[in-house]
Amino acid sequence: MNQLEQLRQFTTVVADTGDFQLMKQYTPQDATTNPSLILKAVQKPEYRHLLEKAVQDHHGNGGVDAVMDEVLIAFGCEILAIVPGRVSTEVDARLSFDTEASVAKARHLIQLYEQRGIARERVLIKIASTWEGIRAAEILQRDGIRCNMTLLFSLVQAVACAEAGAQLISPFVGRIFDWYKKQAGEQWDAAANGGDNDPGVRSVRQIYDYYKKFGYPTEVMGASFRSTTQILSLAGCDLLTISPELLEQLAAGQGPVAHKLSVDQAQAANIARIAADEPAFRWQLNEDAMATEKLAEGIRLFAADAVKLEKLIGEIAK
């Protein structure tokens, strides 16, 4: 049994890509997309037709915004024809500090899916884990619109998401690792900060243990991986979303995979509850330089890629 097959015994495997042709061979349960992955995919010749069709059908009716939504839905529907489970579709990162606009955009995306015969249960709406984004998720979840809280780098963000009733969170492993490695510079000790001691792995384990200790139903899906070592260090997490490149490495890997995270261990752990109301959330996030910087950077990067996609749409529409 290869490492991917072994991992599936403990964890739901999710494909992290907009390249739906590439994901087929790994038979993931779910798939996740984001603005950067969609931008990357539409620049490939085999997906160009989806962008061109969206422009042709919608540019005169709703402009660039309508085309952007149509592109997201087109990719989502193609992915849902491949995976048996759910697809994650992201709300524009430029709405990350606007609760009302995030709610409106999420409802519109779900409406577009439902018009194509896709049940809302098969869609997760991705929203950045800002205070405003978490409040949007709270409203949406009450409407039966399930949310995947992204750009999550800290325990306080995770606790606030769980208390808001979010369906799922995506704590980022690789970007946390990147931050600590960059801070350490030449002092970075790869051996001391690898495997179970990887700062990104430790963050997800802390969140997973907290959720299971206190009985939160919110699903934990580790995301943003730099290596198969990071992935295998989180075997047992509810879900892990993995790029095709790393799925390929796992499928070729033959070493044993150990069960790392478990509900029993988490429930037996000595963990204190933390406050996650607005003052506590803002203070704890502000105290965490890594989480503050990575959340801000992540929003900027996703927003920049949304702008690039808009420019691409504008060029095709001319």
Curated annotation (Swiss-Prot):
Annotated localization: Cytoplasm
Any one GO MF annotation of this record: transaldolase activity
Pfam families documented for this protein: TAL_FSA (PF00923)
GO biological process, one term: carbohydrate metabolic process
UniProt xrefs under Gene3D superfamilies: Aldolase class I (3.20.20.70)
Family: Belongs to the transaldolase family. Type 1 subfamily.
Function of the molecule: Transaldolase is important for the balance of metabolites in the pentose-phosphate pathway.
HAMAP family attached to this UniProt entry: Transaldolase_1
Protein name: Transaldolase
